[in-house]
Amino acid sequence: MFTKPDNLQAYLNSADKIITHNGIFFDFPVLKKLWNITVKKSQVVDTLVLARLYDPSIENGHSLDAWGERLGYYKAPYKQIWSWMTWTFLDKDNAHLPFDEPVIPLLHHYCARDTLVTAQLYKHLEKEMQHDFSEKSKELEHQVAIIIAEQERNGFKLDERAASQLLCELKAKLEAHTTSLQSIFPPKVQSNRVHKTTGKALADIVEPFNPGSRKQIAERLIEKGWKPSKKTEKGSVIVDETTLEGINIPEAKAIAEYLMLQKRIAQIESWIEAIESDGRVHGKVITNGAVTGRMTHHSPNMAQIPNSGAVYGPECRNLWTVEKGNSLVGIDASGLELRMLAHYMNDDEYTHQVVSGDIHTTNQKAAGLETRNQAKTFIYAFLYGAGSAKIGSISGGGAKEGQLLIDRFLRNTPKLKRLREKVSRIYADKGWLPGLDGRKLLVRSEHSSLNTLLQGAGAVVMKQALVLLKKELNRQKIWHEFKVNVHDEWQIECHEADADTVGQLGKEAIKQAGIELKMRCPLDGEYNVGKTWKDTH
């Protein structure tokens, strides 16, 4: 046990590897804050990072408790240790004991079990990952985790006053809209009721419409002529935003607006609740949270901030801002998913159309669709593994028309057809796919295999570009703070004078990532500068 920071720092400096579980996001920042202890990035091995790379969606998660259970090494959960501690704070006369007397032995035990489980987990992962995961993929995930841990500590400034004002406006709109819905859907009245025993007349039962009840929404819309096609496993009608958008009944539009207002209010309330004493929201990120290798977000989910094309999206994005004298730089990869497709197709003409031509018109002709907009919807639905019925709905048809579209499109893009077949064969043979940087991509189903491959490649590209950009910003000593890393987008706060430099460096990092990863389709990016997220994306 170390009781002096100098002794601990010297010990850590002498180590080749420092193995922790969640050290990047917790232990190392705590040591830095309390004792000013620093750890070299090259020394860090984080079993949480490795475990999430190994299997992002493993049942029961990646806590040391869960891994201890899997590996047969039970560790006392923190809540149990805390419970013991609270009981041992008091002596027989209920007088408080000195803090360190009862607590330190318990914490020693807790720490020892943590260390044991972490060591066993490291050995387990080292063995399991030696063949199907490259050193490059492990190194990349550690580098990204270090950057994102810093991003979490940075936080993103939210204009609390403007957020509260928008919240009040939306609540007023929701109240007015709720009143209007009572006119659209009048109360149901059960009249002419009599008591079963006495035969006496009973008062009418008046049931007002409850727009918060999905069951009532379904019943009322069916009465208006809606014929639902989607139901849950238990037979309940599915009512959600997507379903309501497809119902060509005025009353459905009114319900959709109610649910949208309700959702926006809940979102803004969660952002305001998340503001910390520094005026910023410190959203949490799992850097390899999805099976594709993409990051996932929570507390709050920064990937679900409404975009500028959504209803009240501009107003919501306008709430996220920077400190006085600074700028926000939004950087996006250009056409990332289609460039990943071009890389794997290895078709010179298709690559040319993606990079320099009009790929959506090319796809429109290949599929035989009427409009370019239909082609844009079609290609992404196709790549996401949509079924023939969904594909058919794009052109106003059904499953039969959808299958004809798919067949025609594949017939006219033979290299895509061959890629699709190859990916399906690999999945059928292995049950997983090799990722762009030599990682193992676990695939949920055959129909999602191509999409997993493409999204996985895009995730690796953006992570590699992130590492390159961070390195260059540090090399040039440009002050910056990452605010958001979502899919193919970065939001970065910097001094106003450096904004264009940061944007250009971001574009170059994306290009360079493509070169380093030996992409057969050149990559590019674009950026915008402003004061709020509305300005930059």
Features from the language model and the residues they span:
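Active-site-proximal helix-loop-helix substrate-binding element of RNase H-like nuclease domains
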Residues: M1-P5, Y11, D16-E126, Q364-A367
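Short hydrophobic beta-strand that contains or immediately precedes a catalytic carboxylate
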Residues: I19, V44-V45, P211, L328-D332
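Short active-site loop/helix that positions an aromatic residue
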Residues: I24-I37, R52-D55, A218-G225, S334-E349
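Conserved "right-hand" nucleotidyltransferase catalytic core of DNA-directed polymerases
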Residues: R70-Y74, W84-Y312, S327, E337, ...
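Conserved catalytic core of nucleic-acid polymerases
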Residues: D204, H282-G283, T287-A290, K365-V486, ...
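Short, contiguous acidic/charged loop-to-helix segments that flank catalytic cores in large enzymes
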Residues: G235, W271-E276, A303, S308, ...
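Function-dense linear segments that define catalytic or interfacial modules
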Residues: T287-E370
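Short amphipathic alpha-helices in soluble, non-transmembrane regions
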Residues: V502-I510
